[in-house]
Amino acid sequence: MKSFCLLTLFLFISPFVTNAQSMDELLSSYVPATLKNPEGGKFNYRYSTPDKMEKGTKYPLLVFFHGAGGRGNDNKGQLVDAGGIGAFDKAGLTSRRNSHVFAGQVPKGERWVDVHWSLLGHKMPKVSDSMRMALEAIDAYASDEKNQVDPKRIYVMGLSMGGYGTWDAIQRRPDFFAAAVPICGGGDKSFGEKLKGLPVWAWHGDKDRVIKPSRSRDMIEAIKKAGGNPKYSEIKGRGHNSWTDAWNSKEMWEWLYSQKRR
């Protein structure tokens, strides 16, 4: 697990953010916030709004589930993890696509989904505290009228631990999201029928030794068997960093933001 975290930390530095100043500038464009519930729990998240918003217009929202390296309580790591913040800037999410971006943070020692990543399969467990509060925070953000979120264009994406989170979120809410991009994650194959109508594009490296590519293959196959038409990109020679391929794919971003829930 230590080597995995170090790999994640190394990878975020090089592909998408070049220096500390750039990182600080990008982070400053994301507003820090915390959801608190009556039971005393709290959930940290950051959000960024479209660069230009006009009254009466609705805008898309991208929900991002970070990987294990982004855990903590600094309300920064979730965007620094694997270079997500730089990738989103490069893709022009808030500028060219006029999109909201929402990124919550899992505390250290916790997970989006309470299953071990080395498993070759799992049944969907009880919702984790982090996932439950993330969904509550997303609901609050999306329903806030001042944010002008288009409920038919809410997208979800996540990598590694967040890839599991992405599958978990769409399994729990197959009719909430307009499209999903789970990257090197895994889900519950028995949900193929419920997910057959949701646009999904999964990514995995064929040399991934942290989370086996069979986890993505199995989910895609389950959806296809149920009559769905998911997309799947398995990157030849790639280890546990297929998010670099996904984020560098202009086709993926175009596909994602063209989706609209019926």
What is the meaning of each model-derived region?
Residues A68-R132:
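Active-site machinery of serine-nucleophile hydrolases
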Residues K52-T57, W112-L159:
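Gly/Ser-rich "nucleophile elbow"/oxyanion-hole loop immediately N-terminal to the catalytic nucleophile
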Residues L35, I183, P199-R262:
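C-terminal catalytic histidine-bearing segment of alpha/beta-hydrolase fold enzymes
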Residues S143-K196:
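Primarily recognizes the serine-hydrolase "nucleophile elbow" in alpha/beta-hydrolase
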Residues T18-L61, S99, S130-M133, A137, ...:
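A domain-start/cap signature at the N-terminus of enzymes
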Residues M1-S22:
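Bacterial Sec-dependent N-terminal signal peptides
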Residues D81-G92, C184-E193, G197, S214, ...:
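Alpha-helical scaffolding within the catalytic cores
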Residues F65-G67, H204:
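The conserved beta1-alpha1 loop
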